[in-house]
Design a protein with these regions (language model features):
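A residue-level marker of the well-folded mature domains of exported/periplasmic proteins
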Residues: 3-389
């Protein structure tokens, strides 16, 4: 099992705050801001990264919706240290900082100690740091739906799944996909591969004869119609891709809701001893699934029913009987798993073929993210010349 220091001190907020402050909130919060200066910290210019561009799209949505109530500026790391860029943003008057990459956590923690009146948020999850709030989404909800679609659309019982990094929440997405596929195809088996390993994971799956593949989720609503190589797709005989269902992020919805919660006074209504992690699902609007218009009507209808059920809470992917790869019963089906149990999964369902890759095998560009957010981060030795987060 995963040993996460101070895990009990993490408060997972699984739903956005209410629309407005109550009487007690107004009393406890003598000063609720009327205007906020907001800084977005990027690892590179938006045109160089789809991930950064997606967050920049979210930044634009925030500005459009809140108008004169916010002043928003972007700060790009370039060749500078993250800490240096943060200090410049704070000196410029930033009240709120959105750090859009997990590699920024260490710099945010240091800055939060020096600037306790600035609100710091980092795009990560399951982090026990009280000075920096984390934000992310329950992607497993989307993967359950795309798994059901894949199970219905495969010509065989074998479906490929490309996971990005072995970090908190990834096994939950794999398992939810596997459970969804089993729901529509009882004999479905999921062949797991990893984008963090050398080589092309999609090509490896194709070489094994897999023709329905779940790739990583799409990072922005603006690209959901064009990036068919992401999401879940079928490879046709001529090599072209038939899109089936694509999970996608709407970061603008998340940024809008978080900033509105600050304006409503919700930010101060928590204990200072707890680390706050926002982990929202499809019901919040932060995540959704685009069902392809090319799906058969019945599969389209099923996908829509699953979307509605997950959003209203009547469908919970992990409220089912589950065995892991070693035959151990993980849930008897009488209850769902807690958010903490879901996030900390380090096992796979019995219809998944694959395992968590060793840290030593990862591509260098993935290593830092896994060192910070990885399932086995507590077992890693500190890097030479620096300490672990």
């Amino acid at each position: 099992m995963i040993a996460l220091e101070n895990e009990r001190a993490i408060e997972l907020r699984t739903e956005p705050a209410g629309k407005g402050p109550g009487v007690l909130t107004k009393i406890l919060n003598a000063v609720i801001p009327e205007h906020l200066d907001i800084a977005f910290l990027y690892s590179c210019p938006p045109e160089e990264s789809t991930w950064v561009r997606a967050h920049d799209d979210g930044r634009k949505v925030l500005e459009d919706r809140l108008g004169s109530r916010v002043t928003v500026k972007t700060w790009v790391r370039g060749g500078k240290d993250y800490g240096e860029v943060l200090e410049a943003a704070i000196a410029d008057g930033a009240d709120v900082v959105f750090a859009t990459d997990a590699g920024m956590i260490s710099a945010c923690r240091k800055a939060a100690t020096l600037h306790p009146n600035v609100r710091f948020l980092n795009c990560a999850v399951f982090q026990p740091y009280t000075g920096v709030r984390m934000y992310n989404g329950r992607t497993y909800e989307c993967k359950f739906i795309t798994g059901a679609v894949a199970g219905a659309m495969t010509r065989s019982d074998t479906i490929g799944y490309v996971a990005n990094n072995p970090i908190f929440g990834t096994p939950a997405s794999v398992n939810a996909f596997a459970l969804g596929a089993r729901m529509t195809n009882p004999n479905a088996r999921i062949v797991l591969d990893w984008a963090c390993l050398p080589g092309d994971p999609v090509q490896r799956l194709l070489e094994q004869g897999v023709t329905v593949i779940s790739n990583r989720e799409i990072v922005s609503p603006s690209t959901v119609q064009t990036h068919f190589e992401m999401g879940t797709f079928r490879v046709l005989l001529d090599g072209s891709l038939l899109p089936l269902a694509s999970p996608f992020w709407d970061w603008g919805e998340l940024y809008d809701k978080i900033v509105r919660s600050i304006f409503s006074g919700d930010w101060k209504t928590v204990s200072g001893s707890q680390a706050i992690n926002y982990w929202w699902g499809m019901a919040s609007g932060v995540l959704d699934v685009k069902l392809s218009d090319l799906l058969p009507d019945g599969v389209q209808s099923l996908g829509q029913i699953l979307k509605e059920g997950i959003c209203d809470g009547s469908i919970q992917p992990f409220r089912t009987r589950m065995f892991d790869q070693h035959g151990e019963l993980r849930n008897d089906g009488s209850h769902t798993l807690s958010p903490e149990e879901i996030l900390s999964m380090d096992w796979f369902c019995d219809n998944v073929d694959g395992c968590i890759p060793d840290y030593s095998l990862l591509r260098p560009e993935h290593a830092e993210t896994v060192r910070v957010l990885g399932l086995y981060r507590d077992s890693l030795l500190p890097e030479a010349g620096g300490g672990q987060l």
